[in-house]
A protein has these predicted regions:
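Metal-dependent phosphoester/phosphodiester hydrolase catalytic core
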Residues: 1-279
């Protein structure tokens, strides 16, 4: 039996509507009126997390918007939960993060926008907030799945745009703490998903235990130009595809000789596989 699910990882419908519920609802109404969207969501379970543009606006996070405007975090979380039928959306939680078990895959979607602590940037827990960090630690500790996916709206690695809005300029210690938790999952294959940077890229993240983490960042369905598809340091980059290349990512999972095995494919609008990575 084949189980299919679709994950949207930020900037998926709303674009920079700030604290305006009317404009936010209008963007989602236009999404809902699209026949291709209707057909796809009627046949494939879909979950989503946000990034800067469908949170508030470009590079905005936490409670501080452009020109020091206040981000109405609770309003935006409420609007989000009205528009996306995510797992655990009815839980009383300070954030839109959630987890779901999809066949053999444990999917963990992080909220990398609304929980940031602007006045503590550069400190431990400033990126996810202490509550979400504790939740992630506990969620990973109890997971018995052979495959674990962890997604966040912004990139895990620092190779693109000098990490101007992600872990590398916010919470390096917190990121390494999470990687340590992942290292402890010796019987699971853990993959990282991300978005934000226009284009599509894959990276290897070597770990001290000799294992390799993989990050797949797919943002090639948007219509805006973006940074160079390759970072200045290409030593750990698997591939790079520029923005407006109209491609989506696919992950398939199975056991190979009793061990968890995942295959990533990048597929363009014609159905051609333009990248294939066996992890």
């Amino acid at each position: 039996m084949c189980i299919r699910d679709r994950f949207l990882i930020g900037d998926s419908a709303v674009d920079g509507r700030k604290n305006d519920p009317g404009l936010i609802k209008t963007d989602y109404m236009l999404r809902n009126l699209s026949p291709p969207v209707q057909q796809l969501t009627a046949n494939v379970p879909t979950s989503a997390t946000w990034d800067d543009h469908d949170y508030w606006g470009d590079d905005v996070s936490g409670t501080v918007g452009h020109r020091n405007r206040t981000v109405e975090v609770e309003l935006l979380r409420k609007m989000w939960k009205m528009q996306w039928n995510n797992p655990q959306r009815d839980l009383d939680r300070a954030g839109i993060y959630f987890e779901a078990q999809i066949g053999p895959v444990h999917y963990i979607a992080l909220d990398t926008r609304s929980c940031r602590l602007n006045d503590k940037r550069g400190e431990l827990n400033s990126f996810l907030g202490p509550q979400q960090m504790n939740w992630l630690k506990e969620t990973l500790e109890v997971s018995t799945s052979q495959f674990i996916l962890i997604s966040g709206g912004t990139m895990w690695t620092d190779y693109i745009s000098k990490a101007k809005d992600t872990w590398g300029t916010w919470d390096i210690e917190g990121r390494e703490t999470i990687f340590g938790w992942i290292d402890a999952k010796k019987d699971s294959q853990v993959l990282l998903l991300s978005g934000d940077r226009h284009g599509a890229r894959g990276f290897k993240i070597p770990r001290p235990n000799g294992k390799t983490l993989y990050e797949f960042e797919i943002g090639t369905l948007g219509g805006c130009p973006g940074p160079d598809p390759f970072g200045e340091d290409r030593s750990q980059q698997l591939f790079g595809l520029e923005s407006r290349s109209w491609a989506f990512g696919e992950l398939t999972f199975k056991l190979r000789n009793g061990k968890p095995d995942a295959t990533f494919r990048l597929i363009d609008a014609s159905g051609k596989v333009v990248q294939r990575i066996l992890t």
